[in-house]
From Swiss-Prot:
Family of the protein in this entry: Belongs to the UPF0246 family.
InterPro entries: YaaA
Native source species: Burkholderia ambifaria (strain MC40-6)
GO BP annotations, alphabetical order: response to hydroperoxide
Full protein name: UPF0246 protein BamMC406_2140
Length: 260
């Protein structure tokens, strides 16, 4: 089983890492190519391209200038400890044991606009480059064209080491990021957990709740060493319950009803 997550825009480089081990990203050469292109942009260009504020554009202009193809704990931090958004609050890597993080290293992957595909302990230099950014490059009009089938092939290398029901990809990423994966080329079926909350008289996806829940699901898989998708139906964290009637073989729906 391989779980894919989206990255986070919010980053934490202030909290010291609680584990010393780290690895190097697989696609550093590709990231360097993107950085070379990003360095040609002015802060105003970045603000327009990414639809962000001027201060945030200046911050990322400097990040691109500072970025180095040489990674070390002096200029980078393990990805799963650096990302700091809703998904990673749910995953809460800071409270995972070294053994859990080692398991995550084998089973969790993070999709990234700049880095392509990251393992949890891959060192990450600070950046902002969302996968949906229409950043024209030598390979095409956007980042989906840039990455092509590279991410899918890297996932297949891992999936092909699994067998039977354990050869499955669990999609805990957003639609924007999972578009960088080509399911028809994957060497495994895809199961997508969907999290819905009761609001306004019906169940619906509420973005920040769903993001946190996807992180919780990844944590649940890691802590319980889950290898086959059937066991995902037992997930019941923070009052979410599997709804068999709303689910099918490729979409597992979890619902929560609180306060109504």
């Amino acid at each position: 089983m391989i779980i894919v997550l989206s990255p986070a825009k919010s980053l934490d480089y202030d909290t010291p890492a609680h584990v010393p081990s780290y690895t190097k990203p697989a696609f550093v050469d590709d990231a360097s190519e993107l950085i070379d292109g990003l360095r040609k942009l002015s802060p105003q260009d970045i603000a327009t391209l990414m639809d962000i504020s001027d201060p945030l554009a200046r911050l990322n202009f400097q990040r691109y200038a500072d970025w180095s193809p040489t990674f070390s704990p002096a200029n980078a931090k393990q990805a799963v400890l650096a990302f700091n958004g809703d998904v990673y609050e749910g995953f809460d890597a800071k409270s995972l044991s070294a053994a859990d993080l080692d398991y995550a290293q084998q089973h969790v992957r993070v999709l990234s606009g700049l880095y392509g595909l990251l393992r949890p302990l891959d060192l990450l230099q600070p950046y902002r480059l969302e996968m949906g950014t229409r950043f024209a490059n030598a390979r095409g009009k956007d980042l989906y064209a840039f990455w092509g089938d590279r991410i899918t092939r890297a996932l297949n290398e891992q999936l092909e080491t699994r067998s039977g029901a354990a050869r499955v990809l669990v999609n805990c990423a957003s639609t924007e990021y999972f578009k960088s994966v080509k399911p028809k080329l994957l060497a495994a079926p895809v199961v997508t957990p969907v999290f819905e909350d009761w609001k306004g008289g019906r169940y619906k996806i509420i973005s920040f709740h769903a993001k946190r829940a996807r992180g919780l699901m990844a944590r649940y898989i890691v802590e319980n060493r889950i290898a086959e998708p059937a066991a995902l139906k037992d997930f019941a964290m923070e009052d979410y319950v599997f709804d068999a009637a709303a689910s099918n073989d490729s979409t597992y729906v979890y619902r929560r009803r609180i306060g109504e």
